[in-house]
């Protein structure tokens, strides 16, 4: 298996800097730092694909990875999609939402999407700051991209149920962000979305679905451990993590 090599990154083109410490969004009473790749306008899809393989992620036009002092809790993870074996509840979610209508749309602002985003943030992440995002903050976070990004809308006869942002890489898809209707209990939209994205990887002949970071002691991240098999980037090497447990 090819391993990422930081020495092979385009350092001649990019510069990397560490941010000042800020409160960690996932582990209470901890501070986080990020390493940011700049300048943003030079990070095209090819370079971004290389950065993803070394643990970077994207938020708007900013590409970053954790760079925390004395903490390595954030583990970049990806699914090898041809090996993915959904469990019973995951198969049930796929069947339950099989009739959702799926549309790929331009990366533009849509009032209904922003309204759904606000409802999702207020229900799932109250008090986290994003539940107060303005139109401009929403657009900067999700609708600004310098790489190959797809906006996917899922709907039924009652309206829009879920919106997902996906980046296309040279070896897979990267799940950027997903928000969905929070008012339907036990809908498992998130589970369905990951399996749908994995199926899209297979349809495109791409081997991996990148899911961002998994943190053992963060409930927000626990769902990622439910998809097996899964690989994690440990000390610069992508390794199978067969014993991840839901926490």
UniProtKB/Swiss-Prot annotation:
Keywords, in A-Z order: Acyltransferase, Cytoplasm, Transferase
Matching InterPro entries: Acyl_CoA_acyltransferase, Asp_Glu_LeuTrfase, N-end_Aminoacyl_Trfase, N-end_Aminoacyl_Trfase_C, N-end_Aminoacyl_Trfase_N
Principal place of residence: cytoplasm
GO biological process: ubiquitin-dependent protein catabolic process via the N-end rule pathway
UniProt keyword annotation of Signal present: no
Record localization: Cytoplasm
MF (Gene Ontology): arginyl-tRNA--protein transferase activity; leucyl-tRNA--protein transferase activity
EC number: 2.3.2.29
GO cellular component assignments: cytoplasm
Entry function: Functions in the N-end rule pathway of protein degradation where it conjugates Leu from its aminoacyl-tRNA to the N-termini of proteins containing an N-terminal aspartate or glutamate.
Name recorded for this polypeptide: Aspartate/glutamate leucyltransferase
Natural source organism: Dechloromonas aromatica (strain RCB)
Gene: bpt
């Amino acid at each position: 298996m090819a391993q990422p090599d930081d020495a092979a990154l385009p350092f001649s083109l990019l510069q990397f800097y560490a941010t000042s410490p800020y409160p960690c969004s996932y582990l209470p009473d901890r501070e986080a730092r990020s390493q940011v790749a700049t300048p943003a306008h030079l990070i095209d899809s090819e370079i971004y694909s290389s950065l993803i393989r070394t643990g970077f992620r994207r938020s708007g036009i900013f590409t970053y990875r954790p760079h925390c002092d004395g903490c390595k809790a954030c583990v970049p993870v990806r699914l090898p999609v041809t090996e993915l074996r959904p469990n019973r509840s995951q198969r049930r979610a796929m069947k339950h939402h099989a009739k959702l209508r799926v549309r790929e749309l331009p990366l533009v602002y849509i009032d209904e999407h922003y309204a759904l985003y606000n409802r999702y943030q207020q229900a799932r992440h109250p008090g986290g700051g994003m539940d107060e995002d303005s139109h401009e903050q929403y657009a900067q976070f999700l609708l600004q991209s310098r790489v190959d990004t797809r906006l996917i809308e899922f709907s039924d006869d009652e309206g829009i149920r879920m919106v997902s942002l996906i980046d296309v890489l040279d070896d897979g898809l990267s799940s950027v962000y997903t928000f969905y209707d929070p008012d339907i209990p036990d809908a498992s939209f998130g589970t369905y979305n990951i399996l749908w994205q994995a199926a899209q990887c297979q349809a495109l002949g791409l081997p991996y679905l990148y899911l961002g970071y998994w943190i053992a002691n963060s409930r927000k991240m626990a769902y990622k451990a439910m998809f097996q098999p899964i690989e994690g980037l440990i000390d610069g090497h992508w390794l199978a993590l067969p014993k991840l447990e839901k926490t």
